[in-house]
Curated annotation (Swiss-Prot):
The keyword Ribonucleoprotein applies. Located on the platform of the 30S subunit, it bridges several disparate RNA helices of the 16S rRNA. Forms part of the Shine-Dalgarno cleft in the 70S ribosome. PANTHER family: 40S RIBOSOMAL PROTEIN S14/30S RIBOSOMAL PROTEIN S11 (PTHR11759). The gene is rpsK. It comes from Pelotomaculum thermopropionicum (strain DSM 13744 / JCM 10971 / SI). This is Small ribosomal subunit protein uS11.
Length: 129
């Protein structure tokens, strides 16, 4: 019995002008996701995906490279302007925003959406080094 040749569905080029860049910056990594205004993902990248491993993922330079990679892919879909939503306390917050601007995207809005508990879960005990 012969196998059927299946072709991978080629990603169609959407023509999206404006979108939202979500930057999640933790102490260990930075993840940049670019979506349209409805929330559908156009492109994403992270410090680990760009090629950094271990403690180098948490550097501002790794965040810059991740944002640049995501922006380049999004601009292929016709993206021109973004609103930036930043979440988390990591080192790559500002570097990622600057990199999006340097890549050629127009940043309209920068908003901090870091979740803050209203006295929710008990935090882990303090480290003693």
């Amino acid at each position: 019995m012969a196998r059927r040749v299946t072709r991978a569905k080629k990603r169609e080029r959407k023509n999206i002008v404006s979108g939202v860049a979500h930057i999640k910056s933790t102490f260990n990594n930075t993840i940049v996701t670019i979506t349209d205004t409805k929330g559908n993902t156009i492109s994403w990248s992270s410090a680990g995906q760009v090629g950094f491993k271990g403690s180098r993922k948490s550097t501002p330079f790794a965040a810059q490279m991740a944002a640049e990679s995501a922006a380049r892919e999004a601009m292929e879909h016709g993206l021109k302007e973004v609103e930036v939503m930043v979440k988390g306390p990591g080192a790559g917050r500002e570097a990622a925003i600057r990199s999006l601007q340097a890549a050629g995207l127009e940043v309209n809005l920068i908003k901090d959406v870091t979740p803050i508990p209203h006295n929710g879960c008990r935090p882990p005990k303090r480290r003693r080094v």
